[in-house]
Regions:
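Sec-dependent signal peptide cleavage junction
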Residues: 3-22
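Residue-level preference for non-acidic, small/hydrophobic
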Residues: 96-99, 114, 164, 194, ...
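Glycine-rich catalytic cores of cysteine/serine-nucleophile enzymes that process amide/ester linkages
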Residues: 91-151, 174-185
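Activation targets extended, charge/polar-rich intrinsically disordered C-terminal tails
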Residues: 16-18, 54-57, 63-65, 181, ...
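Non-catalytic propeptide/linker segments at domain boundaries
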Residues: 30-92
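Short extracytoplasmic/periplasmic juxtamembrane "stem" segments immediately C-terminal to an N-terminal membrane anchor
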Residues: 25-26
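Active-site nucleophile-His-acid catalytic modules used for acyl/amide transfer and hydrolysis
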Residues: 148-208
Length: 232
């Protein structure tokens, strides 16, 4: 007698796909498991790989980032239970410099990055407003936030900042797991805004690991970025 396990294998794959999509969506507030799966399907088609392999990489990258974020939170004594916007103010800095602060949603310290569009202004993408430009001291940050310079020419830094400002009004996107593979125009999150700006205007990839998604800490750990100030 020959036993067939093909049906069981299909069900197992479906179950794993659903689990990955559900866990990813829980870490990306504002997205649904169905949207995650659709995004994976489209990217899998482009890359000629399986949807399951893309979902697995999405899941691996975002859970790894979560672990890193929670380690940082525990070292700094911050709660991972969400909500804090910080009590420190950003200082003035040079146009084209960037900043990073810890930031929480869905019990996950994903971090947040923005760019100086002038010595006294920043441009960033945030939920609700999308891409916006505000006064430097309008942004509250956590202790141990950092300001970084990017290793390109002043002209390139300024061009990157100007491009970011040109995107003011773009909506916010909660999609981090696949943001390297979406268009430079339209909805974008904080790390996608900076990544696109320097890719298009300075010709560099400031994503340190080159995964499917670029996260805030991927930028701060890039060989192109260097910390010049810690805020505490």
């Amino acid at each position: 007698m020959v036993l067939s396990f093909s049906g069981m294998n299909v069900k197992a794959k479906e179950s794993e796909t659903a689990r990955y999509a559900k866990e990813i969506a829980e870490l990306q507030q504002g997205t649904s498991p169905q949207e995650v799966i659709q995004s994976a399907k489209e990217l899998a088609k482009q890359k000629h790989v399986t949807t399951e392999s893309i979902l697995k990489q999405f899941h691996s990258e975002i859970t790894s980032d979560k672990v890193q974020g929670n380690v940082i939170a525990s070292k700094t004594g911050l709660s991972v239970m969400g909500g804090s916007s910080g009590t420190k103010k950003l200082p003035k800095s040079v146009k084209g410099n960037i900043y990073y602060t810890n930031s929480y949603t869905a019990f996950y310290n994903h971090g947040h990055v923005g760019m100086y569009s002038a010595a006294d202004k920043i441009v960033e993408s945030v939920p609700g407003d999308g891409v916006r430009q505000i006064a430097y001291n309008g942004r509250e940050v956590e202790d141990n936030s950092i300001v970084q310079t990017v290793s390109v020419t002043d002209t390139q830094k300024q061009a990157a900042a100007d491009w970011a400002v040109s995107r003011v009004g773009d909506e916010y996107s909660f999609n981090f797991v696949n943001n390297r593979n979406t268009g430079h125009e339209g909805a974008k999150n904080c790390s996608k805004l900076l990544w696109s700006a320097f890719l298009l205007k300075a010709g560099i990839d400031i994503d340190s690991n080159g995964g499917l998604g670029v996260y805030p800490r991927d930028i701060t750990s890039s060989p192109y970025t260097k910390t010049i100030l810690t805020i505490n």
